[in-house]
């Protein structure tokens, strides 16, 4: 790590000097030209943080995710019997692979909402759950009804072929949809992922 004055030191030495195994950093970005309190107002729902210019036509791919949850009243175990995603992404070149990409994204979003978490040992800064024995991911028994709806779209503004990237479109809103479904079922607004049993205990 190099300081502005040119001095440098190895990260391992800094960790040792601090007596800490983990360093966390939190940062906020305020677009150029926006007032300094824009982010705080945005958090409070008092303003919309909009900056930058773009052509008049919006050419992004879009999706909306819907989730049904069942929560055991005794154990607070959360199950997801149904995932539905509706997507529009321009001209689809290969329906089969596009559907598979979106379906796996829905499952991944559910996984990040309820299971996945990288755990660190604070003393050594080493990953505790570094293999699939300890890092939780969904298995077939965790995935029930997954429905992908692909809406037709002709977009000649995006590019001459009218195609758009799917990428991670399937998982973008899924964990938020899971959290909203949990809130609807329990009245508890959970703002940290993954949502664990202890978050739902009274």
Map each language-model feature to its residues.
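C-terminal catalytic domains of large/alpha subunits in multi-subunit enzymes
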Residues: 1-202
């Amino acid at each position: 790590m190099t300081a502005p004055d040119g001095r440098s030191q190895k990260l391992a030495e800094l960790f040792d000097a601090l007596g800490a195994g983990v360093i966390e950093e939190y940062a906020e970005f305020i677009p150029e030209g926006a007032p300094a309190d824009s982010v705080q107002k945005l958090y409070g729902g008092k303003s919309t943080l909009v900056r930058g210019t773009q052509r008049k036509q919006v050419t992004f791919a879009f999706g909306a995710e819907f989730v049904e949850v069942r929560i055991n009243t005794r154990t607070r175990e959360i199950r997801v019997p149904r995932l539905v995603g509706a997507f529009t992404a321009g001209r689809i070149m290969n329906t089969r692979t596009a559907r598979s990409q979106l379906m796996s994204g829905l499952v991944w979003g559910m996984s990040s909402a309820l299971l996945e978490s990288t755990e660190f040992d604070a003393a050594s800064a080493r990953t505790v759950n570094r293999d699939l024995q300890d890092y939780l991911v969904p298995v077939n028994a965790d995935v029930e009804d997954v429905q992908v709806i692909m809406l037709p779209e002709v977009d000649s503004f995006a590019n001459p072929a009218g195609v758009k990237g799917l990428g991670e479109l399937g998982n973008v809103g899924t964990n938020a949809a899971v959290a909203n479904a949990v809130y609807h079922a329990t009245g508890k607004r959970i703002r940290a992922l993954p949502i664990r049993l202890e978050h739902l205990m009274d």
